[in-house]
């Protein structure tokens, strides 16, 4: 796996689902659904905090306070991977080759009038399969509350040819910039 997170990648899908399950399995028992939902509004903070915790051999955050056992980081990783596989089988079926990232990760360019169901098809564009993630140059961030619905992406892309300024290229996706 190249870690590029193309829309065709299967490994990206498993990795992103694993990250999502790891965040929930690490934080949900301490926070509860309501506080985790509020915490989720802080951009990539849940992911950053969980990634930092995973670098430690042990932390009280890994222990599920709702069980009598004391869970470890490795227990959370193991559980999260199994949860991710089960979740993807439910969402995308049993054929792993069909687990392309773009089947889950989509972008839709929405218009304010498109929030009404009768006008959605007239004003909104998409959804389209898209690559990227929270940590790639082709930004494709999403929230825990709406997994894999791309909410943050590049607003413009430009290539400047400094030897020939007239050869400069730019593209802007639909929507406001």
Regions found by a protein language model. Give the residues of each.
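C-terminal/peripheral segments of proteins
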Residues: 1-177
């Amino acid at each position: 796996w190249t870690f590029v997170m193309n829309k065709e990648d299967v490994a990206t899908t498993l990795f992103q689902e694993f990250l999502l399950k790891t965040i929930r399995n690490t934080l949900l028992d301490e926070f509860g659904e309501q506080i985790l939902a509020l915490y989720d509004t802080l951009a990539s903070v849940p992911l950053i905090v969980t990634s930092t915790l995973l670098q430690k051999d042990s932390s009280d955050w890994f222990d599920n306070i709702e069980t009598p056992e004391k869970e470890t980081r490795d227990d959370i990783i193991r559980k999260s991977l199994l949860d991710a596989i089960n979740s993807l089988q439910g969402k995308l079926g049993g054929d792993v080759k069909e687990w392309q990232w773009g089947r889950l990760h989509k972008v839709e360019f929405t218009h304010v009038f498109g929030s009404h169901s009768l006008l959605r098809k007239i004003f909104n564009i998409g959804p389209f399969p898209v690559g990227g993630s929270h940590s790639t140059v082709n930004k494709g961030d999403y929230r825990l509350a709406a997994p894999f619905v791309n909410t943050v992406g590049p607003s413009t892309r430009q290539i400047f040819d400094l030897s020939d300024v007239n050869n400069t290229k730019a593209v802007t996706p639909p929507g406001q910039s």
